[in-house]
Amino acid sequence: FGGKEKMLALGKYPEVSLADARARRDEARKLLANGVDPSENKKAVKVEQEQEAITFEVVAREWHASNQKWSASHSARVLKSLEDNLFAAIGKRNIAELKTRDLLVPIKAVESSGRLEVAARLQQRTTAIMRFAVQSGLIDYNPAQEIAGAVATAKRQHRAALELNRIPELLHRIDHYSGRPLTRLAVELMLLVFIRSSELRFARWSEVDFETAMWTIPGERESLEGVKHSQRGSKMRTPHLVPLSRQSLAILEKIKGMNGNRELIFVGDHDPRKPMSENTVNKALRVMGYDTKTEVCGHGFRTMACSSLIESGLWSRDAVERQMSHQERSSVRAAYIHKAEHLGERRLMLQWWADYLDANREKGVSPFEYSKDKKR
């Protein structure tokens, strides 16, 4: 070909029969007659066949395996979500042939079922998988980039929180709650440390260090048999440090006297091997006379604490955000904040918040006024 003698292997006998070899020879002659190099054509066909074998599922599994920093449980959840929602529709498709409209089909199906948060996560993961394909040299362009805005976002749920001038009323109702003592202490502690519900109800005694006055909520907890979601630790899946005020330590000491021999801090009403119900705090607030949808709910304590700390003007935004355990969008800034921790300031801040609540037991005072009084 091209004035040069070339050899073309037709296959080994007996794997390739004589009849097949003759057919391949004849095909090669046809290619030569059309000005096509049979050996180069053979290579091109082989490359094409290899590319056809690179499916969305193959790439998705490689992307999944590359995320080695994920916890085992999170990794398993991500893979199951891909298997349940994406692979059946586009898993066997050649990664290079997928268009934006193809990627949207399974995501829109999930959206149509009303699972908007799941659809949003699938959109993010599909984009990441296709980006991985670009970075791996499998495709030149990421068609998932065009999905942005095509999937409805879940309506942000409003968490009811009291106006700060109603804090004295809330404290009075907590102090006079006549239900289960452990429930009253749970509500009071949740207000003092303003952590999330699952972070509180799945808490273990092993996480609390009374000597250093520190509660370390792990990124993931050991699962409790028969208890759904009991592996949940901090929402950000990294250890969250909660400095304990004198008031918080006193509450934990009281609880320790009740069930310090148990693994869980907040044991269930009927079975001490299981945690209190996820509805315990909100149910107690309803017993106190509050509408947990319009007035205040357990999660609303976080809003009240955050508003008070900012209004006081005493604390840096970084310290407040770190204690709230909010996700920092900038990875560079997140790394800085995580490393710095602001622990010294946060210790003072949590003690100030506890003292501020005590001051409101005597008379109503705003965070700003209380901070001015403390400075005098």
Specify the residue positions occupied by each region the protein language model found.
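Basic, Lys/Arg- and aromatic-enriched nucleic-acid-binding interface segment
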Residues: 70, 110-125, 135-203, 210-211, ...
